[in-house]
Amino acid sequence: MSKIPGSNLEFVREEDFVEYYIFPKIPDNVQDEGALRKLMLQIRNEISAIVREKSLERSYLWHKDEFQLQVRLGGAEERLLNEETNPEEEAELGDLPPHFHGVTHYGDNISDEWFVVYLLTEITRARGDCIARVSDSDGEFLLIEAADALPDWASPETCEQRVYLVGGHLQLLQNSAASSQDKPLTMAMAVQRIRMNPTLYRCSQEIQSCIDARLKEYQIAQPHFSIHRQVLELPHSAAQLLKQKPRLLSSAVRAFCERDSLDIKALRTMRYFPPEATRVRTNVRFTRCLYAMLSHQQYLPEKRLGWHLTDPVSEPERYKEQLLGLKLASGLEILATQAKRVEGQQLEDLPAWRSYLRSLLSKGYFRDNIEGSAEYQELLNKAKVYFRGNQERFRTASRAGAEILDLLLHPAEAASEELRDEENNLQPSDSDEWLNISAEDLDSMLQDRYGPKKLYKPNGQMNAEEFTKQLAEFLDRQSNYEGIEHRGLEEPELDSDDDEPPPQANGSTGLTAKVKKNPSMRKACQRNSVIQPEEPDSTHVRNFLDFVIPEDNWDSTSEMSDYADEDDMESNLNALSGGGSVFPLDRQIQSYMEQMDRELAQTSVGKSFHGKKKTAPQADEDDFDDIEDFEPININVNTLRNMMDSYQSQVGGAGPVSNLFSAMGVGMSAVEDKEQKDISESAV
């Protein structure tokens, strides 16, 4: 598992986690640690009330871990216990101010990650003094969501630890062009900058709209659309337990879906949840993710245990209720068995504790104290308390199993009464047709989310001007190991990082720390360190698109339009010659080109170009009857027409134009391939 600066409890972390920080504003007069902790606990209670309200309004079910916050005062010993730093990383991360920290594992349900973002947005909106930061195993995933709207300077390297939520809005602290790429901005420095000017770093509306669109499903104060209600037939003890602790449902489903050979052995006896002669029917709320996981698990119980199922053909709905019920009861059985297996295990026997202790030793937590001394033992006891407390933060299988065993020993009579009342007033199960999706629906969803840009206006005509603009922008880019980049664009003047050193006079910041640590990538970068000059083909196409169209000079002897001034002519000739350095053009060649213009003007080649619309003649144009048929060439329309003709000649197959369209992010549907679109001046 890769180390992330500022990460928490690395030894229990999986890849599917989201990590978040909340920095409240602490008054200057609160200096005492006891008073500070009391204030932090009070603020946490207020934040927890907001989270509870939003979760209940939406009847939200967590897939694995819930949203939770731990108080962090930012002390050095606390950070060592929390596995946040190595001694050599202290200068990089800086001293964090008092804050709340949380980690939520979302498993297979990505909705939990975005619900965390929604909660942080609402918390910072309700409490304007709070600044929040959120990231996951991919880093700044909020910027990944808004990738199409980011400024040119934004990249994973330049934006590390620079994305924050303030007042319900996304803020991105810009990096200085003179800053070091190997040293990310510390969170303490970022929070300080935002405090100084809370609105300076607010993202553009386009970026904010990308995030708001992703959070739209959570903003309605009603049960979330992902909730699926299903009637199940369960053993009475299992149904009673789920009424007492509905959150055990997700642990049971995951345990059943992830069962191993030891778990299957436990299912052959069903010691804790035997299939009783009379089972109860009850309403159970799933998330769609959990329901899909449970439904698609292939499992048939042993009949000798007493799992009698109805005929799936004659009573399919009743069969589904029974089959899903026995799967869920089996998951609860697995959890109880796992907890019983480790019930008497000592802390020193846990692999996680041994790994945690080794980590503390390597980071100098015990200082120079001799093992067994009073100081050493005091620090060791602190570490044990801290370890146990943090283990209880997460919904591990053993913790859920221990909770099940405790509830079986102390059943609640109120839950039994609720079951009896509910059995006479069962709500019907929700339709699960959403499980079935056709290929056409999937294609439509992918097209809406990731589909290429269209060239058509709402009236069905093609936008020639937009097409040539996209083509010119695409050709004006260069490629290296990081992908296609804009060429020739100067970096904007950005805020300076006071804590970051200036660059070397002749240094380059192109190689990031990740590249330096990766030998294969470093070699690839060295091979590509010299950027090759542009290909002649792309240069010529760009020059054609940028060609200056002069005003007509009616006094010219040429039969086609001449150049209105000498500067335009020189710029066009230099453009076609590559700047005059590769193919120098003298006056004799220029005269040849002018003669060719005159000869081609009245030929089929000259007439094949699409011209611009003629405007009504003015009073002072009566003397130009001899050139009334002249139409200036429309570069945009002619470029698009030629590209479309070439595309149609490929009959939808691979070829130069379709490959260019794909690289530009431009798509042509099958229907559009067959129809002849109106490519005219009105389309521009």
UniProtKB/Swiss-Prot annotation:
Biased composition annotated in UniProt, kind: Acidic residues: 491-501
Single GO MF descriptor: snRNP binding
GO biological process terms on file: chitin-based embryonic cuticle biosynthetic process; ecdysone biosynthetic process; germ cell development; germ-band shortening; Golgi organization; head involution; instar larval development; instar larval or pupal development
Subcellular compartments: Cytoplasm
Region ranges (Disordered): 491-528, 603-624
Keywords, comma-separated and alphabetical: Cytoplasm, Developmental protein, Differentiation, Oogenesis
Tissue expr: Expressed in the ecdysone-producing larval ring gland, nervous system, imaginal disks and gonads.
Superkingdom of this protein's organism: Eukaryota
GO CC, alphabetical: cytoplasm; nucleus
Physiological role: Required in both the follicle cells and the germline for oocyte development.
Family, similarity comment: Belongs to the ECD family.
PANTHER family linked to this entry: PROTEIN ECDYSONELESS HOMOLOG, SGT1 PROTEIN HSGT1 SUPPRESSOR OF GCR2
Protein's UniProt name: Protein ecdysoneless
Originating organism: Drosophila melanogaster (Fruit fly)
